[in-house]
């Protein structure tokens, strides 16, 4: 399936988390029924925490700091908020003949790694610690988190990339259940980029990486 058939939707203001989940669930049904195109949805949320299907109470360190939403994506606790670019990806793995979840996650990783490389950020995918990582001043830190769900072989939820995120909000959780490593952002790495600049490269790299994902 050509990447030209994938719709791109970019939001200019923060989207309520529950509203976003409801939209994705309806979109999954429409894609499965052949009524709508696949979609990559770029947005940001107000400051909040989400608890994936693997979340444990011990990983929520400050329950009163921000709103907390339980969600059906994979993974544990993560933070979403201003300065973080979220890409919710709704693709039909069945029509792409790619009913392979591991391959899909790896392809997501390749997409983000190639995008970051454009901005001279060297990053890598760690299959044991899901997400995209960088080494900064000799310390490994996560710059992009993954959390996906697949229903009817349609993917949804997706990837969050820290651009100029307030990293102090991560102190209220154990991000993705990983105590040993921290998080970082474009800003902390000394890379200044706008959403507009990032989105252009993100779409370009998506078309390159996912062109063979069918």
Swiss-Prot record:
SUPFAM superfamilies: Class II aaRS and biotin synthetases. The active site is at residue 176. It catalyses: octanoyl-[ACP] + L-lysyl-[protein] = N(6)-octanoyl-L-lysyl-[protein] + holo-[ACP] + H(+). Pfam families: LplA-B_cat. It is found in: Cytoplasm. Catalyzes the transfer of endogenously produced octanoic acid from octanoyl-acyl-carrier-protein onto the lipoyl domains of lipoate-dependent enzymes. Lipoyl-ACP can also act as a substrate although octanoyl-ACP is likely to be the physiological substrate. Belongs to the LipB family. In the reaction, the free carboxyl group of octanoic acid is attached via an amide linkage to the epsilon-amino group of a specific lysine residue of lipoyl domains of lipoate-dependent enzymes. This is Octanoyltransferase.
